[in-house]
Amino acid sequence: MMVAIYIRVSTEDQAKEGYSLEVQREYLEAFAKRVGLEIFRVYQDDGISGYSTERPALKELLKDAKGKKFDLVLVYKIDRFSRNLKDLLNLVDELLSSGVGFKSATEPFDTTTSAGKLIFQQLGSFAEFERNRIAERVFPGMVKGVQRGNWQGARYAPYGLYV
């Protein structure tokens, strides 16, 4: 069975450091080998939120799925694929309608059974919940930074902007 691996990190720091991407890649490649899956390609989105579907590698993966270039999408955890339940369900439906399966290497669910679908949806709900909690924790710090005159949104203010 031909498999596409999808890995993602949310922040530029994680993308530059590479640790999380490296861990995901190595784990998924070892998992695929252990269960006898042939890797078609690794799709990687660096420093892009899982709350958005506007991700270059994700779009390419979906295009290749429609072209039937692989049989299965393999992720480390479903929150690497999406942290928005509605988007997650739509993305997986899009894969399934193209004849492509979806599997997490670390979470046990089987979307061909009613119990498996329930577990999958619960895990998707937890991913969205965690994303919302992260936003709740980060927002007050960002407000405080603005009040102190610090630039928010990137490491440095855009060229020519003084803060």
What annotation goes with each model-predicted range?
Residues M1-K144:
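Short, structured surface patches at the beginning of a domain
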Residues N132-V163:
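Coupling/hinge elements of helicase-like and P-loop NTPase modules
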